[in-house]
Amino acid sequence: MPAVPIYVKGGVWSTVEDEILRAAVQRYGTHAWNKVASLLPRKSGKQCRARWEESVRPTRQGAWTAAEDATLAALARGGPQWRSVGAALGRPAAACAARWAELTGDQAVAGPAAGERIPGAEGLPAVPEEDEREMVAEARARLASTQGKKAARRARERQVEESRRVARLQKRRALLQAGVNSALPLPRAVRGQLDPNADVLYELAPAEGVFETANEAARDRAAREAYERQIEARGKRTARKQSRAPARAPATEQPALQVRRAIPRPPLELPVPEALLKNSAAPTAAVRRALARLWQGLPAAKNDFDVAPESEDEQPSGSADAAVQSTDMEVLLPWEPPLRQDLPPPPPPPPGLLAEHYRALAAAAAGGPACYDTPDVLRQREAIERALAAEPSPAMLHPQCELPRLPSLDALRAAAQPRPQRRLAAHAATDAGSRLLAYELLPDLATKQREYYVRYTAYELERTAVATRVRRLTAGR
């Protein structure tokens, strides 16, 4: 196996590489420099980008004019940043640097020569033309293809599969000529699918059990014949109906809506329910009685004139209403509102002692004197009250059993008078104590706490220093 040549990324750009770079940028754009570099084995993505931006990019090419030389001189004196200068002039940065070196005679600006990048480039072997031809052929093939890598791979796979299928057919044909029957093996992709040459598509196996198949063909034939006869009969009846159908009405015939309106119809009369026929008079009489009671309950009219009919034609109707009202009033009892009716007279009292007692209770209930407040009863009650007041109250057996005696109203008022003064004095004392605590005691306490903290810290430091001195003196002995 021949040795694989080792390429060093970099080196001088050749004319062929520049042409491949232009074609690759035209195909992949100015953002996929790794794809562009894949067509150039000796160059990286960064080198392809730099070569494109500085030299190969199709900017202004040709001879320099006097105005461009003046602009180049002004920009180069301010700071020779050749990318910015090239963007301002519309030329590559390398061309601007070379032009400035040509104008000033400074070769250090243009950079070293082409052969000075690699030391001892003259002693190295020349690049063989075979590698360059392979690079150009690969770039031409990749740039000329209109399909992607996946599409090309799938096309190759389809060609391989077709060639395999043809080979299997030729092999089977040869075996059949030799007298050996062999089925074509299914590919792996469709191994679990149905084979239309060997299987029955969508076959349903009959259920397990006794199943008679002797008369199955006869039953199928009879069912098909019955269906055909039914279809034929329906078709004949349909044709007969179409032949008997009347002809269509002409376009000038009156619309169906107008014909329907022109036909006279009797008014709709519904039968009256039997319940209303039987009880139709009873509710009317009850309503009339109720209205008559309401009219009787109204107060009497305050005007002293009668309402006379406007014309003589109204008198018969009024007389008829009066007759109806008189007829209804004949069956009604006189009725008055309860507020205007007097109380019924009391029943006659029963004779005897029980009757007297009953009369006394009734009189007391009506608002008269009590039945027991007779003069004798009143005198007896006063005597009992005087006797009870004259008797001295017995001393209590225990002091705790005595009932508390409430002070009089004057005593309570006298005791309540000095309370506002005492409340004001208490408020003043509380205010003075709060001020003393907030403005004097608490600040004094804070000051003393700080002094104590400072002195205690000084004491701790001094005690630590003394302990250190004692320890040193003890160690020195």
UniProtKB/Swiss-Prot annotation:
User: In which domain of life is the source organism classified?
Assistant: Eukaryota
Point out the DNA-binding stretch(es). 33-56
Where in this chain does the record put each Myb-like domain? 59-104
Q: What positions does the domain HTH myb-type occupy?
A: 1-58
Question: Region Disordered: start and end of each range?
Answer: 233-262
For biological process, the GO terms are:
mRNA splicing, via spliceosome
Tell me where it mainly resides: cytoplasm
What GO cellular component is one of the record's annotations?
A: Prp19 complex
Matching Gene3D superfamilies = Homeodomain-like
* Its biological purpose: Involved in mRNA splicing and cell cycle control.
Q: How does it assemble?
A: Associated with the spliceosome.
What's the protein here called? Pre-mRNA-splicing factor CEF1
What is the phylogenetic placement of the source species in the record? Eukaryota, Fungi, Dikarya, Ascomycota, Saccharomycotina
Q: Which gene encodes it?
A: CEF1
